[in-house]
């Protein structure tokens, strides 16, 4: 049985993952610039290799965040649908959840959307 509390949790989860994804994207940009700068300045090969590893790890997190976001979004949609079936169609939590779903789908279009 879906509850408003579960809906709030799933909404917050989606928001947190979106924030995390943006953070990783910024980190990749920052680390890529740092790596390019190190290459231009002729940095020590060991340091350059370590920096490339850092950049690679940051890049690996983006697809992981996308998968988690798709899963969290699916959970949120199903919880929202369950609540609407039980005639709870209004309220600040439901509006927030609908807004979050719309925002996530607009920013990150999925294959099924």
UniProtKB/Swiss-Prot annotation:
One of its GO terms (molecular function) is beta-tubulin binding. The keyword Endoplasmic reticulum does not apply. Residues 83-113 are annotated as: Disordered. It holds the Pfam family TBCA. Changing residue 25 to A: No effect on beta-tubulin binding. Tubulin-folding protein involved in the control of the alpha-/beta-tubulin monomer balance. Functions as a reservoir of bound and non-toxic beta-tubulin. Required in the developing embryo. This is Tubulin-folding cofactor A. The gene is TFCA.
């Amino acid at each position: 049985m879906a509850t408003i509390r579960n809906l709030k949790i799933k909404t917050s989860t989606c928001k947190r993952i979106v924030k995390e994804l943006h953070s990783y994207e910024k980190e990749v940009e920052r680390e890529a610039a740092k790596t390019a700068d190190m290459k231009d300045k002729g940095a020590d090969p060991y340091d350059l290799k370590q920096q490339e590893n850092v950049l690679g790890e940051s890049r690996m997190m983006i697809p992981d965040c996308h998968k988690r976001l798709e899963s969290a979004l699916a959970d949120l949609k199903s919880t929202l649908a369950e609540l609407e079936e039980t005639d709870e169609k209004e309220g600040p939590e439901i509006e927030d959840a609908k807004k979050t779903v719309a925002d996530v789908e607009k920013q990150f279009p999925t294959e099924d959307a």
